[in-house]
Protein backbone atom coordinates (compact mmCIF):
# COMPACT_ATOMS: atom_id res chain seq x y z
CA UNK A 1 0.00 0.00 0.00
CA UNK A 2 2.82 2.41 0.85
CA UNK A 3 5.81 0.27 -0.28
CA UNK A 4 8.67 0.65 2.22
CA UNK A 5 8.36 4.39 2.66
CA UNK A 6 7.78 5.93 6.06
CA UNK A 7 4.16 7.04 6.39
CA UNK A 8 3.82 10.64 7.57
CA UNK A 9 0.28 11.83 8.27
CA UNK A 10 0.65 15.55 8.95
CA UNK A 11 -1.43 18.70 8.99
CA UNK A 12 -3.33 21.01 11.35
CA UNK A 13 -5.81 19.60 13.84
CA UNK A 14 -8.85 21.37 12.40
CA UNK A 15 -9.61 23.33 9.23
CA UNK A 16 -9.55 26.99 10.30
CA UNK A 17 -10.23 28.41 6.84
CA UNK A 18 -9.08 27.96 3.24
CA UNK A 19 -6.15 30.38 3.31
CA UNK A 20 -4.40 29.11 6.44
CA UNK A 21 -5.07 25.47 5.55
CA UNK A 22 -3.45 25.91 2.13
CA UNK A 23 -0.60 27.86 3.72
CA UNK A 24 0.19 25.09 6.20
CA UNK A 25 -0.25 22.33 3.61
CA UNK A 26 2.05 24.14 1.17
CA UNK A 27 4.73 24.54 3.83
CA UNK A 28 4.57 20.85 4.76
CA UNK A 29 4.77 19.97 1.06
CA UNK A 30 7.89 22.12 0.74
CA UNK A 31 9.49 20.50 3.79
CA UNK A 32 8.79 16.87 2.85
CA UNK A 33 9.57 17.17 -0.88
CA UNK A 34 13.32 16.44 -0.41
CA UNK A 35 12.31 13.14 1.24
CA UNK A 36 9.77 12.13 -1.41
CA UNK A 37 11.62 8.91 -2.25
CA UNK A 38 11.55 7.79 1.40
CA UNK A 39 8.55 9.47 3.05
CA UNK A 40 4.91 9.05 2.00
CA UNK A 41 3.16 12.22 3.16
CA UNK A 42 -0.60 12.34 3.66
CA UNK A 43 -2.27 15.65 4.52
CA UNK A 44 -4.73 15.55 7.41
CA UNK A 45 -7.19 17.99 8.89
CA UNK A 46 -10.68 17.78 10.38
CA UNK A 47 -13.85 19.47 9.15
CA UNK A 48 -15.52 18.87 12.53
CA UNK A 49 -14.00 18.25 15.94
CA UNK A 50 -17.09 16.61 17.38
CA UNK A 51 -15.60 15.77 20.79
CA UNK A 52 -14.32 19.15 22.00
CA UNK A 53 -14.17 19.53 25.78
CA UNK A 54 -16.42 22.61 25.82
CA UNK A 55 -19.67 23.44 24.02
CA UNK A 56 -18.11 26.85 23.30
CA UNK A 57 -15.01 25.50 21.53
CA UNK A 58 -14.50 25.89 17.77
CA UNK A 59 -15.40 22.69 15.94
CA UNK A 60 -14.57 23.45 12.32
CA UNK A 61 -16.29 24.62 9.13
CA UNK A 62 -18.55 21.60 8.84
CA UNK A 63 -18.73 18.76 6.33
CA UNK A 64 -19.56 20.59 3.10
CA UNK A 65 -17.16 23.54 3.45
CA UNK A 66 -14.49 21.34 4.99
CA UNK A 67 -14.52 18.89 2.10
CA UNK A 68 -14.39 21.78 -0.37
CA UNK A 69 -11.21 23.07 1.29
CA UNK A 70 -9.66 19.60 1.48
CA UNK A 71 -10.44 19.14 -2.22
CA UNK A 72 -8.65 22.42 -2.94
CA UNK A 73 -5.57 21.20 -1.05
CA UNK A 74 -5.66 17.94 -2.99
CA UNK A 75 -5.95 19.67 -6.36
CA UNK A 76 -3.32 22.31 -5.56
CA UNK A 77 -0.61 20.05 -4.14
CA UNK A 78 -1.44 16.63 -5.56
CA UNK A 79 -1.35 15.10 -2.09
CA UNK A 80 -3.46 12.34 -0.58
CA UNK A 81 -6.01 13.50 1.98
CA UNK A 82 -7.09 12.03 5.33
CA UNK A 83 -9.95 13.22 7.49
CA UNK A 84 -11.92 11.74 10.36
CA UNK A 85 -15.57 10.75 10.04
CA UNK A 86 -18.23 10.35 12.71
CA UNK A 87 -21.21 8.68 11.03
CA UNK A 88 -21.94 6.38 8.08
CA UNK A 89 -23.38 9.34 6.16
CA UNK A 90 -20.24 11.41 6.70
CA UNK A 91 -18.06 8.47 5.64
CA UNK A 92 -19.83 8.18 2.30
CA UNK A 93 -19.58 11.93 1.65
CA UNK A 94 -15.94 12.24 2.73
CA UNK A 95 -14.90 9.31 0.53
CA UNK A 96 -15.80 11.42 -2.52
CA UNK A 97 -12.80 13.64 -1.71
CA UNK A 98 -10.54 11.84 0.76
CA UNK A 99 -8.23 8.91 0.08
CA UNK A 100 -8.14 7.82 3.72
CA UNK A 101 -11.02 7.84 6.20
CA UNK A 102 -10.04 7.99 9.84
CA UNK A 103 -12.06 6.36 12.58
CA UNK A 104 -11.62 8.49 15.73
CA UNK A 105 -10.26 6.77 18.82
CA UNK A 106 -13.47 7.36 20.79
CA UNK A 107 -15.47 5.70 17.98
CA UNK A 108 -13.14 2.82 17.12
CA UNK A 109 -15.65 0.13 18.18
CA UNK A 110 -18.67 1.61 16.37
CA UNK A 111 -19.65 -1.20 14.01
CA UNK A 112 -21.91 0.80 11.67
CA UNK A 113 -19.26 3.49 11.23
CA UNK A 114 -16.44 1.01 10.59
CA UNK A 115 -18.49 -0.96 8.08
CA UNK A 116 -19.79 2.10 6.22
CA UNK A 117 -16.32 3.63 5.98
CA UNK A 118 -14.83 0.35 4.76
CA UNK A 119 -17.57 -0.08 2.16
CA UNK A 120 -16.43 3.12 0.42
CA UNK A 121 -13.23 1.18 -0.46
CA UNK A 122 -11.10 4.01 0.93
CA UNK A 123 -8.08 3.25 3.08
CA UNK A 124 -9.25 3.10 6.70
CA UNK A 125 -7.10 4.48 9.51
CA UNK A 126 -8.40 3.14 12.82
CA UNK A 127 -7.13 5.04 15.84
CA UNK A 128 -6.84 2.83 18.90
CA UNK A 129 -9.11 4.00 21.68
CA UNK A 130 -7.45 5.30 24.82
CA UNK A 131 -9.54 2.70 26.63
CA UNK A 132 -8.40 -0.34 24.60
CA UNK A 133 -5.47 -2.69 24.89
CA UNK A 134 -3.58 -3.14 21.62
CA UNK A 135 -4.80 -6.72 21.17
CA UNK A 136 -8.42 -5.55 21.48
CA UNK A 137 -7.96 -3.79 18.13
CA UNK A 138 -8.49 -7.11 16.37
CA UNK A 139 -12.23 -6.52 16.76
CA UNK A 140 -12.31 -3.23 14.79
CA UNK A 141 -9.95 -4.75 12.22
CA UNK A 142 -12.29 -7.71 11.70
CA UNK A 143 -15.25 -5.36 11.21
CA UNK A 144 -13.43 -3.59 8.37
CA UNK A 145 -12.24 -6.87 6.85
CA UNK A 146 -15.82 -8.20 6.87
CA UNK A 147 -16.58 -5.83 3.98
CA UNK A 148 -13.76 -7.18 1.82
CA UNK A 149 -11.70 -4.02 2.32
CA UNK A 150 -8.21 -4.89 3.60
CA UNK A 151 -6.68 -1.42 3.21
CA UNK A 152 -6.11 -0.64 6.87
CA UNK A 153 -3.78 1.51 8.97
CA UNK A 154 -3.68 1.19 12.76
CA UNK A 155 -2.74 4.22 14.84
CA UNK A 156 -1.50 4.14 18.43
CA UNK A 157 -2.30 7.34 20.34
CA UNK A 158 -1.68 6.45 23.97
CA UNK A 159 -3.71 4.90 26.81
CA UNK A 160 -5.60 6.58 29.63
CA UNK A 161 -3.42 6.63 32.72
CA UNK A 162 -5.38 7.97 35.65
CA UNK A 163 -7.11 11.33 35.38
CA UNK A 164 -6.11 13.83 32.67
CA UNK A 165 -3.13 11.81 31.50
CA UNK A 166 -2.04 9.39 28.80
CA UNK A 167 0.86 6.96 28.64
CA UNK A 168 2.41 5.36 25.55
CA UNK A 169 3.28 1.67 25.82
CA UNK A 170 5.69 0.85 23.01
CA UNK A 171 4.80 -2.84 23.26
CA UNK A 172 1.67 -1.77 21.40
CA UNK A 173 3.68 -1.27 18.18
CA UNK A 174 4.66 -4.93 17.64
CA UNK A 175 1.28 -6.16 18.94
CA UNK A 176 -0.60 -4.05 16.40
CA UNK A 177 1.93 -4.91 13.67
CA UNK A 178 1.21 -8.60 14.21
CA UNK A 179 -2.28 -8.00 12.80
CA UNK A 180 -0.68 -7.53 9.39
CA UNK A 181 -1.19 -3.82 8.73
CA UNK A 182 0.97 -0.68 8.89
CA UNK A 183 1.15 0.86 12.37
CA UNK A 184 1.41 4.62 12.81
CA UNK A 185 2.27 6.39 16.05
CA UNK A 186 0.38 9.59 16.87
CA UNK A 187 3.09 11.74 18.37
CA UNK A 188 0.90 14.73 19.16
CA UNK A 189 -2.28 13.30 20.68
CA UNK A 190 -0.08 11.00 22.76
CA UNK A 191 1.23 14.01 24.68
CA UNK A 192 -2.22 15.41 25.42
CA UNK A 193 -3.48 15.94 28.95
CA UNK A 194 -7.20 15.29 28.27
CA UNK A 195 -9.32 17.94 29.96
CA UNK A 196 -6.20 19.15 31.73
CA UNK A 197 -7.10 22.81 31.15
CA UNK A 198 -10.70 22.37 32.37
CA UNK A 199 -12.51 23.48 29.19
CA UNK A 200 -9.81 22.15 26.85
CA UNK A 201 -7.01 19.61 26.74
CA UNK A 202 -3.50 20.43 27.79
CA UNK A 203 -0.34 19.00 26.31
CA UNK A 204 3.37 18.34 26.79
CA UNK A 205 4.93 18.93 23.39
CA UNK A 206 8.43 18.67 24.86
CA UNK A 207 7.95 14.89 24.87
CA UNK A 208 7.06 14.59 21.16
CA UNK A 209 10.70 14.06 20.05
CA UNK A 210 11.25 11.36 22.67
CA UNK A 211 8.04 9.44 21.96
CA UNK A 212 8.35 9.61 18.17
CA UNK A 213 11.93 8.34 18.34
CA UNK A 214 10.84 5.50 20.62
CA UNK A 215 7.96 4.53 18.32
CA UNK A 216 10.13 4.40 15.22
CA UNK A 217 12.76 2.41 17.11
CA UNK A 218 10.00 0.00 18.17
CA UNK A 219 9.13 -0.60 14.52
CA UNK A 220 6.33 1.85 13.73
CA UNK A 221 5.73 2.25 10.00
CA UNK A 222 5.15 5.95 10.34
CA UNK A 223 4.01 8.95 12.36
CA UNK A 224 0.88 11.03 12.79
CA UNK A 225 1.83 14.63 13.56
CA UNK A 226 -0.49 17.59 13.95
CA UNK A 227 1.42 20.76 13.10
CA UNK A 228 0.64 24.44 12.74
CA UNK A 229 2.49 27.62 11.82
CA UNK A 230 1.36 29.25 15.09
CA UNK A 231 0.09 26.60 17.53
CA UNK A 232 -0.43 29.12 20.33
CA UNK A 233 -3.30 30.72 18.41
CA UNK A 234 -4.64 27.53 16.81
CA UNK A 235 -8.37 26.94 17.26
CA UNK A 236 -8.00 23.33 18.44
CA UNK A 237 -5.31 21.33 20.26
CA UNK A 238 -3.12 24.40 20.62
CA UNK A 239 -1.30 22.81 23.56
CA UNK A 240 -0.25 19.65 21.74
CA UNK A 241 0.42 20.64 18.13
CA UNK A 242 3.99 20.80 16.88
CA UNK A 243 5.23 24.14 15.50
CA UNK A 244 6.19 23.85 11.83
CA UNK A 245 9.74 24.94 12.66
CA UNK A 246 10.11 22.04 15.09
CA UNK A 247 8.49 19.72 12.54
CA UNK A 248 11.15 20.80 10.05
CA UNK A 249 13.95 20.16 12.56
CA UNK A 250 12.67 16.67 13.41
CA UNK A 251 12.12 15.48 9.82
CA UNK A 252 15.74 14.41 9.14
CA UNK A 253 15.89 12.61 12.48
CA UNK A 254 12.69 10.67 11.77
CA UNK A 255 13.90 9.84 8.26
CA UNK A 256 17.29 8.55 9.42
CA UNK A 257 15.88 6.56 12.32
CA UNK A 258 13.18 4.92 10.20
CA UNK A 259 15.75 4.01 7.52
CA UNK A 260 18.13 2.62 10.13
CA UNK A 261 15.49 0.44 11.82
CA UNK A 262 14.20 -0.85 8.48
CA UNK A 263 17.73 -1.75 7.35
CA UNK A 264 18.26 -3.85 10.48
CA UNK A 265 14.89 -5.55 9.99
CA UNK A 266 15.75 -6.43 6.40
CA UNK A 267 19.14 -7.76 7.48
CA UNK A 268 17.53 -10.05 10.06
CA UNK A 269 15.07 -11.62 7.59
From Swiss-Prot:
Family classification: Belongs to the KdsA family.
Predominant place of localization: cytoplasm
Record GO terms (molecular function): 3-deoxy-8-phosphooctulonate synthase activity
A GO CC term assigned to this protein in UniProt: cytoplasm
InterPro entries: Aldolase_TIM, DAHP1/KDSA, KDO8P_synthase
Subcellular location: Cytoplasm
This protein's name: 2-dehydro-3-deoxyphosphooctonate aldolase
UniProt-listed Gene3D superfamilies: Aldolase class I
Enzyme type, top EC level: transferase
Species, as recorded: Chlamydia felis (strain Fe/C-56)
Lineage, top ranks: Bacteria, Pseudomonadati, Chlamydiota, Chlamydiia, Chlamydiales
Domain of life: Bacteria
Amino acid sequence: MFSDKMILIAGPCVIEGEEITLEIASKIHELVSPYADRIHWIFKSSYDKANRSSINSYRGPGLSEGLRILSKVKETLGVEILTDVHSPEEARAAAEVCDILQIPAFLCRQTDLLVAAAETNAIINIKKGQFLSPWDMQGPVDKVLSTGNNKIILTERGCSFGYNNLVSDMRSIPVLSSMGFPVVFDGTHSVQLPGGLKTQSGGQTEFIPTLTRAALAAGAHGLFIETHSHPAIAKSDAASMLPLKTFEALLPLWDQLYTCVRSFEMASV
